[in-house]
């Protein structure tokens, strides 16, 4: 893992052994200052500010800067499409607040769409910028109608050299951030993300990050409070780094789910410096079993390092029967191929839900379970530390107890 990261760093720096030129060149007279636009806000929630923002993008979206000033509020009653941006800098220092209109948002993919954009900074320089998905009505409706289709707050598909930083994202109707479509060189940094319901209905499916088909995605210095996966590595994610993250109330940092209806793969993932609070698991891998329409899942070169477990139900979990019941999996065992999976330097205390069990490793009987564990110092509240295992290697690195499931 370190090798690919170092090679990528060297390539990105463009290191050269050539000596610096002593020739002094006159300034290029063709270089101009970046154009700066500040959209005009309508001033109340009945006015959709998206057209004004779109106009600013038309004027300044090609190499320019769009500024939402500190203390300002913009009401977004429709999809904000950033597709016209090219090497643009969008500085959100005020509040972008989306409408809660469940009829309008029904079936829509995104609230902010970033499709095939090359060069985008969506950021707050002051840390005061907020993007509010206003998802309460969507969560309440979904609680009574699970067929209601909700949009992702920020949906990236394709494109390259994208930076999202310094912002607070709050209350998305569904997922916070999604990356797919072959996007490459995407950085999320210094983000505060929270989904908090004011009713008895939880903010369901509010994944922090769904990383699908993409390469070289980095997530760093992020705090997430939500009600689903904190980070999910979806099919075809490759070369993803997560460094310094705190997740509260989540389903953990997860590979998958994979293999539901096709052959899926996830590879070259490195996660380090995670604090997992009140999560169903700190980290894990979720794969569907064989049989039916399910495909084969391949997971390779994945490292989970330096995790602090704080009242999470499991420290680590492998599920090879995801989405099916035990009877099905007796007839159709898991066949996922797991290779070079490293779990290292886990510490802390689980919740009492499964005490004395702290981890549940259910590798598929018809698959491959190439996993190693080291520096695993997690205990249940009782002080015990049992690890349930099935079909794991003899040199796993921890003492196993039979009885794994999932």
Swiss-Prot record:
Its EC number is 3.2.1.-. The active site is at 228 (proton donor), 251. This is Endo-xylogalacturonan hydrolase A. The keyword Acetylation does not apply. It comes from the Eukaryota. Keywords: Carbohydrate metabolism, Cell wall biogenesis/degradation, Glycoprotein, Glycosidase, Hydrolase, Polysaccharide degradation, Repeat, Secreted, Signal. One of its GO terms (molecular function) is polygalacturonase activity. GO terms for cellular component: extracellular region. InterPro entries: Glyco_hydro_28 (IPR000743), PbH1 (IPR006626), Pectin_lyas_fold (IPR012334), Pectin_lyase_fold/virulence (IPR011050). Pectinolytic enzyme involved in the degradation of xylogalacturonan (xga), a galacturonan backbone heavily substituted with xylose, and which is one important component of the hairy regions of pectin. Activity requires a galacturonic acid backbone substituted with xylose. Belongs to the glycosyl hydrolase 28 family. PbH1 repeats lie at residues 183-213, 214-257, 266-289, 299-320, 333-375. Residues 1-18 form the signal peptide.
